[in-house]
């Protein structure tokens, strides 16, 4: 239908930083049933120096005062949302200082089973600043970025020229790193206080994310990665047996934002029907107007 439609419309109109990274982002998320539960769990981690995790002892290292400002992009048809993917421009601040800017593209590894996300990144050069969406678009279309894995993957999901800003997200993050005896971070637990914004509408959201180290997951063999996933899953389940204080969620922050802000995704079929109707109406006008004119002239004669 798409090919037919394009040809059809053409007929009517003629008549009238390099350095992207590929990682596996595996996280488990809990939504607190109320704000109190969120802060109670965070407090329990603040007061601990070490934690026993599936028979292993990990040192807890806290990182706080992180602020993320994210702008999400998609097409008018919300093609990325429908394909369980997301694209964002992220600015990261630590203690109020801009520390890192990057573009992130995430895709679900399996469309049926939720087993993690593929993550592709392009780090923004310190000298580059985005004031408008056009700046973002120009940057991602630079020659060096077109050779990145992010660009190649994104292009396979969506027509990049059709991307538009969807909404803004600000989130305050308190993060706890679980490190082994060698000082290597194996797991990360993040407490996120999120505000979704679109025009004058604002919605709050609290979520706790439990993640394995992205780099370790990307390089690990299947046995090791399965063991890490199993340990993390059991740890999260034991935190709240019976889901008394929290609900397990599988929605990405982008999907949550779409729902909380009430942005209804459009479907290609509806758009195509409208365009086809317009095309047919134009065809009728092209053929009927001359016909009526000839009839009128003949009638006068």
What do the predicted segments below correspond to?
Residues 296-301:
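Cytoplasmic C-terminal tails of single-pass
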Residues 2, 14, 91-95:
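Solvent-exposed, well-ordered amphipathic alpha-helical segments
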Residues 2-10:
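Sec-dependent signal peptide recognition
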Residues 19-295:
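Phosphate-end processing signature that detects enzymes handling 5′-triphosphorylated RNA
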Residues 10-18:
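Hydrophobic h-region of N-terminal signal peptides that target proteins for export
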């Amino acid at each position: 239908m798409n090919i037919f439609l394009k040809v059809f419309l053409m007929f009517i109109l003629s008549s009238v930083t390099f350095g992207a990274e590929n990682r596996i982002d595996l996280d488990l998320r809990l939504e607190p049933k109320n704000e109190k539960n969120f802060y109670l769990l965070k407090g329990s981690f603040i007061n601990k120096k070490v934690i026993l995790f599936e028979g292993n002892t990990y040192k807890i290292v806290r990182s706080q005062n992180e602020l993320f400002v994210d702008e999400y992009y998609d097409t008018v048809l919300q093609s990325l949302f429908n394909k369980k993917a997301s694209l964002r421009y992220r600015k990261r601040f630590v203690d109020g200082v801009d520390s890192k800017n990057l573009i992130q593209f995430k895709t679900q590894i399996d469309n049926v089973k939720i087993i993690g996300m593929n993550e592709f990144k392009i780090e923004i050069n310190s000298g580059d600043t985005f004031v408008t969406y056009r700046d973002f678009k120009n940057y991602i279309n630079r020659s060096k970025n077109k050779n990145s894995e992010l660009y190649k993957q994104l292009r396979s999901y969506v027509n990049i020229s059709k991307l538009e800003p969807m909404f803004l997200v600000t989130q305050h993050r308190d993060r706890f790193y679980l490190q082994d005896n060698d000082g290597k971070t194996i797991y990360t637990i993040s407490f996120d206080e999120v505000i979704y914004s679109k025009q004058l509408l604002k919605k709050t959201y609290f979520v706790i994310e439990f993640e394995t180290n992205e780099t370790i997951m990307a390089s690990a063999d299947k046995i090791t990665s399965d063991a890490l996933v199993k340990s993390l899953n059991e740890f999260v389940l034991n935190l709240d047996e019976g889901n008394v204080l929290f609900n397990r969620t599988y929605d990405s922050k982008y999907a949550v934002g779409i729902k909380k802000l009430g942005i209804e995704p459009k479907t290609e079929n509806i758009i195509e029907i409208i365009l086809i109707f317009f095309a047919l109406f134009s065809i009728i006008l092209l053929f009927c107007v001359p016909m009526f004119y000839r009839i009128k002239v003949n009638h006068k004669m």
